[in-house]
UniProtKB/Swiss-Prot annotation:
The active site is at K101. Its EC number is 2.8.1.10. This is Thiazole synthase. SUPFAM superfamilies: ThiG-like. One of its GO terms (cellular component) is cytoplasm. Keywords: Cytoplasm, Schiff base, Thiamine biosynthesis, Transferase. It comes from Acidithiobacillus ferrooxidans (strain ATCC 23270 / DSM 14882 / CIP 104768 / NCIMB 8455) (Ferrobacillus ferrooxidans (strain ATCC 23270)). Pfam families: ThiG. GO terms for biological process: thiamine diphosphate biosynthetic process. It catalyses: [ThiS sulfur-carrier protein]-C-terminal-Gly-aminoethanethioate + 2-iminoacetate + 1-deoxy-D-xylulose 5-phosphate = [ThiS sulfur-carrier protein]-C-terminal Gly-Gly + 2-[(2R,5Z)-2-carboxy-4-methylthiazol-5(2H)-ylidene]ethyl phosphate + 2 H2O + H(+).
């Protein structure tokens, strides 16, 4: 395959699959799934995982060395801009991380983002020098606003977090992609490899997922499937699919037939 890196905040990555670290039975399974997925960027919820905050609990970084993986701290569990900003500041103190995934939840049932709180947090974080990858609704206006204000990537949801419903509104995603000036990565809602392939076929720069792997009957096998789905979808996008037609079009030649 041609050289086709994912570029975020000026850094190149060969994998377009970003993965989370929650819901696995232990850190060993987490690492095995990440390796099977081929992921280079691994997102971690600072409010739920130990990255050095506690000396008495296992440290995830012992399984995910920083020289091999890009750790992407996220603000999962935050419901206000203030909490999200505080969490990102903690990430910078713990590991000098400035690339962060911002999410500010507005509703505990749907886990949809609170866009006002997210905007306020993004504004503060960007001003403080953070490189913000922002979780958003699949609203073209909101996604464009986040890009214009300086977010290094915009991550619209495909469906509610952990739902596994797949891409519910490909048409909004197409509009978001048409006007994109920063990488667009689907975040949340994918359930299986075909969902990932569709996202990449549409032109998304990548996909971030967690539950689709961790909640599978065989997480390691599903991680492999997700990696292959990303690769197939990206290749199909670069190749350019045939146009859709209402009527049939024979693939065999119609002239020079034997019985003519």
């Amino acid at each position: 395959m041609r050289k086709d890196p994912l570029v975020i905040a000026g850094r190149e990555y060969q994998s377009r699959l970003l993965v989370g670290t929650g819901k696995y039975k232990d850190f060993a399974e987490t690492r095995a799934a990440i390796d099977a997925a081929g992921a280079e960027i691994v997102t971690v919820a600072l409010r739920r995982m130990n990255l050095g905050q506690s000396k008495d609990a296992p440290n995830l970084l012992e399984f995910l060395p920083a020289d091999r993986f890009t750790i992407l701290p996220n603000t999962a569990g935050c419901y206000t801009a203030e909490d999200a900003v505080r969490t990102c500041r903690l990430a910078r103190e713990l590991g000098d991380w400035k690339l962060v995934k911002l999410e500010v939840i507005g509703d505990p049932q749907t886990l949809y983002p609170d866009m006002r709180q997210t905007y306020d947090a993004a504004k503060t974080l960007i001003a403080e020098g953070f490189e913000v990858m922002v979780y958003s609704v699949d609203d073209p206006v909101a996604c464009k606003t986040f890009a214009e204000m300086g977010c290094v990537a915009v991550m619209p949801l495909a469906a509610p977090i952990g739902s596994g419903l797949g891409i519910r509104n490909p048409y909004n995603l197409r509009i978001i992609l048409e006007q994109a000036t920063v990488p667009i990565l689907v975040d949340a809602g994918v359930g299986t490899a075909s969902d990932v392939a569709v996202a990449l076929e549409l032109g998304c720069d990548g996909v971030l997922l967690n539950t689709a792997i961790a909640a599978a009957k065989d997480p390691i096998l599903m991680a492999e499937a997700m990696r292959q789905g990303v690769e197939a979808g990206r290749k199909a996008f670069l190749a350019g699919r045939m146009p859709r037609k209402l009527y049939a079009s024979a693939s065999s030649p119609v002239d020079g037939l034997f019985f003519e």
